């Protein structure tokens, strides 16, 4: 029994794909969803981050238990649209695939949750408790929307949280954090013909980087026991088991130097240079440890010439991989997906859960699970399989009913 036809479900997704929310303008999706919820007498509220960025919260049912369903409304930049086979901000159906920016990451998952909420309400299928939909702004960068909702207490009373990021057949109970660490070196600019009276910031930065590589290598040799196991995820993505050595490396802390800047012209000694790292913290080596790790190296080199800035700081998230929510989704999904394709794993990426759960994480059942192939995220010609999009609506409905009934 459904409220929406297949054609209507696809059109609802098409409507929000057309709303261009490239790292901004989520307010347009909020207004669209507010009108949709009003049509079905579902109470909702828009909470602004700023003039153009906002969240929307909608709720059905009452009392406990409370299941939160979440998805983000922002998408990454479409890049050069001439490189797309189909217009990125117009849903195109072709050979069983729905093309468009955000179809996989993650307007497909978000609209599946919205339809779930409406159909459960319209069909009076909620056995007990509350379902709270949290549609967020700014997940792709700083998680501003999730932080706002957490600060306002929207996660304080939840028992379970489903984040419908594209996971295919994977069900994730935990993930690493994500930190952006920028190290800046300062020196003294002079003409390059007299470098001895200046101070080359690049030299200081290289000294830092060489010591960083040495210390990081030593740390990885000690990093052998992990709470998070990401091996099942990699097996699914590459189609085979990865080696124990690779699994150990991937499940631990990782740090990558991804941006380097220094110098403005060839005949001047640079007075500033910087390195930017993306670090993926884990429970054993958390964000506080990472900050101290960088600062200690800076102190060893020269704290008068080096400084550390952390513009992005998201913590790792853990939960029980055998929780009621995980087992419920696994049981329900097995009726729609081949049993041997379903797996439970930790995730190497980060989600809004980092900002949502905070100190409350041990009390919440977490499942990151949604339609879409994660390898399609951020790609040109991004698409979601039509059957998967439609199928996951039914999975979300059944899993929500079962979880609230049995929790």
From Swiss-Prot:
It comes from the Bacteria. Zn(2+) 2 binds at residues 105, 140, 378. It catalyses: N-succinyl-(2S,6S)-2,6-diaminopimelate + H2O = (2S,6S)-2,6-diaminopimelate + succinate. Its cofactor is Zn(2+); Co(2+). Keywords: Amino-acid biosynthesis, Cobalt, Diaminopimelate biosynthesis, Hydrolase, Lysine biosynthesis, Metal-binding, Zinc. It is an enzyme of class 3 (hydrolase). Zn(2+) 1 binds at residues 72, 105, 165. Binds 2 Zn(2+) or Co(2+) ions per subunit. GO terms for biological process: diaminopimelate biosynthetic process; lysine biosynthetic process via diaminopimelate. The keyword Nucleotide-binding does not apply. CDD domains: M20_ArgE_DapE-like. GO terms for molecular function: metal ion binding; succinyl-diaminopimelate desuccinylase activity. Pathway: Amino-acid biosynthesis; L-lysine biosynthesis via DAP pathway; LL-2,6-diaminopimelate from (S)-tetrahydrodipicolinate (succinylase route): step 3/3. Its EC number is 3.5.1.18. The keyword Kinase does not apply. The active site is at 74, 139 (proton acceptor). PANTHER family: ACETYLORNITHINE DEACETYLASE, PEPTIDASE M20 DIMERISATION DOMAIN-CONTAINING PROTEIN. Belongs to the peptidase M20A family. This is Probable succinyl-diaminopimelate desuccinylase. It comes from Staphylococcus aureus (strain MSSA476). The lineage of its organism: Bacteria, Bacillati, Bacillota, Bacilli, Bacillales.
